[in-house]
């Protein structure tokens, strides 16, 4: 049964798993495409605006399930948020000390970013809170966040295996720490910095590799004095946030699927407008260029404190490459798309140092390796990466494991298939890219959406 889903409605988990796509060869991609707003920035913008003194306007807000979950949680905590347009939020901030207790668990849905950042915020409040998530989020590791928060004096419980739900006990006095993060994670860094706003003395976060600095840039935009150097951020507690207006650029991770698709579908020529090019986010762009992609930047400017460009992408034959390990953290969300580019390239592409892929919304490493093998692509899997041997892409049925990025990646593979690719469990695409199917088809994708009532 063909269906058209509304991204504004959250179907029950028992029903979501029956949504599937049939992807097949379409036409060369053409057009000027507007990608939805950045998910990471949208989470932070609505959260920091809620903590600010005064009213903030957010334009370009991503109207997707993950970001709406965060906004709904803030509303439950007493923040008034207006929605004049689907991509706009007017947030009436309550100040750093104005949040109110919720008497029911706070549902983050599939939003790992939302849960981890909210944990950093809620450990500093005078009331107890419980953060829960969907089946996928409930399997993701949280001790990497709860451990440093506990070092600051927070009381926070997880399940026995370190996964959600998170039970947070309010009324704790936090103190700043000098935290050396064992992994490069902007979410860990952001959670600790948020708690640091409420802590005595100074909070320092040091990373093994610099990660995306959305939190640091946005705290600065909201008037917080934060010192940033390579791989290190520090701030003093007790600061207040001042309301400001934010314009959010297009999400690079969402644009990534079109960067890859236009690069591998012969005859394609598209332009992606106003894409955020945070320096710690664009590893995929570097790797695609190493592979021979034809991607040209224009109209560079700043938007919401972030560098923004238009990207023109034209088809070019790709060659396999070795992905530099120092780029892995800068493209951790883009690896599913890269794996498809590698499958379409001539020669071998080698990925290493990417063990973090195993603890995303799914084990993305295993999911991509298994899926590509189903389509006849030779892939050698390792503990922290894979070697992908480029070649023809066949047909088959792919289990996306409810992971939005796995589903979208294999929709690209379907454009190169000798037949069709069926991609199952795709409803969670709405968590990051509402109306992905509509935009993809308008650009030239062969992509049909079905609901299996069984």
UniProtKB/Swiss-Prot annotation:
PROSITE patterns: EPSP_SYNTHASE_1 (PS00104), EPSP_SYNTHASE_2 (PS00885). The active site is at 333 (proton acceptor). 3-phosphoshikimate binds at residues 39-40, 44, 185, 187, 333, 360. It catalyses: 3-phosphoshikimate + phosphoenolpyruvate = 5-O-(1-carboxyvinyl)-3-phosphoshikimate + phosphate. It is found in: Cytoplasm. Keywords: Amino-acid biosynthesis, Aromatic amino acid biosynthesis, Cytoplasm, Transferase. Phosphoenolpyruvate binds at residues 39, 112, 140, 187, 364, 405. One of its GO terms (cellular component) is cytoplasm. It comes from the Bacteria. Its EC number is 2.5.1.19. Pathway: Metabolic intermediate biosynthesis; chorismate biosynthesis; chorismate from D-erythrose 4-phosphate and phosphoenolpyruvate: step 6/7. GO terms for biological process: amino acid biosynthetic process; aromatic amino acid family biosynthetic process; chorismate biosynthetic process. GO terms for molecular function: 3-phosphoshikimate 1-carboxyvinyltransferase activity. It holds the Pfam family EPSP_synthase. CDD domains: EPSP_synthase (cd01556). Catalyzes the transfer of the enolpyruvyl moiety of phosphoenolpyruvate (PEP) to the 5-hydroxyl of shikimate-3-phosphate (S3P) to produce enolpyruvyl shikimate-3-phosphate and inorganic phosphate. HAMAP family: EPSP_synth. PANTHER family: AROM/DEHYDROQUINATE SYNTHASE, PENTAFUNCTIONAL AROM POLYPEPTIDE. Monomer. Belongs to the EPSP synthase family. This is 3-phosphoshikimate 1-carboxyvinyltransferase. The gene is aroA.
């Amino acid at each position: 049964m063909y269906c058209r889903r509304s991204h504004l409605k959250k179907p029950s988990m028992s029903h979501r798993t029956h949504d599937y796509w049939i992807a097949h060869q379409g036409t060369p991609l053409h057009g000027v495409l507007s990608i939805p707003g950045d998910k990471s920035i949208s989470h932070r913008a609505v959260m920091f605006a809620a903590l600010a003194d005064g009213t903030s306007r957010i334009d370009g807000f991503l109207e997707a399930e993950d970001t709406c979950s965060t906004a709904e949680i803030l509303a439950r905590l007493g923040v008034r948020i207006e929605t004049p347009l689907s991509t706009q939020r007017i947030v009436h901030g309550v100040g750093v000390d104005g949040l109110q207790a919720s008497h029911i668990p706070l549902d983050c849905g599939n939003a790992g970013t939302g849960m981890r950042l909210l944990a950093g915020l809620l450990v500093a409040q005078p009331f107890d809170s419980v953060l829960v998530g969907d089946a996928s989020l409930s399997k993701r590791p949280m001790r990497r966040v709860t451990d440093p928060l506990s070092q600051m004096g927070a009381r926070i419980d997880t399940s026995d295996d370190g996964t959600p739900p998170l039970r947070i006990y309010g009324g704790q006095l936090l103190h700043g720490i000098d935290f050396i993060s064992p992994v490069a994670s902007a979410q860990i860094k952001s959670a600790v910095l948020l708690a640091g706003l409420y802590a005595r003395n100074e909070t320092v976060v040091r990373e093994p590799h610099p990660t995306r600095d959305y939190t640091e840039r946005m705290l600065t935009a909201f008037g917080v004095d934060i010192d940033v150097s390579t791989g290190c951020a520090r701030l003093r507690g007790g600061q207040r946030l001042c309301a400001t207006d934010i314009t959010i650029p297009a999400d690079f991770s969402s644009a990534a699927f079109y960067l890859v698709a236009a690069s591998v579908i012969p005859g394609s020529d598209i332009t992606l407008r106003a894409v955020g090019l945070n320096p710690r986010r664009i590893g995929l762009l570097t790797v695609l260029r190493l592979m021979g992609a034809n991607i040209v930047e224009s109209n560079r400017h700043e938007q919401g404190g972030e560098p923004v460009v238009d990207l023109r992408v034209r088809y070019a034959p790709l060659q396999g490459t070795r992905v530099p390990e120092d780029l892995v953290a800068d493209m951790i969300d883009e690896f599913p798309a890269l794996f498809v580019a590698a499958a379409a390239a001539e020669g071998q592409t080698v990925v290493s140092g990417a063990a973090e892929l195993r603890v995303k919304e799914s084990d993305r490493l295993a999911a991509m390796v298994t899926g590509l093998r189903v389509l006849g692509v030779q892939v050698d899997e390792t503990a922290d990466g894979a070697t992908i041997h480029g070649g023809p892409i066949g047909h088959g049925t792919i289990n996306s494991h409810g992971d939005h990025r796995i589903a979208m990646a294999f929709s690209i593979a379907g454009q190169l298939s000798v037949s069709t690719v069926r991609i199952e469990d795709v409803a969670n695409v709405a968590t990051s890219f509402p109306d992905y199917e509509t935009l993809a088809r308008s650009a030239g994708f062969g992509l049909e959406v079905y609901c299996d009532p069984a």
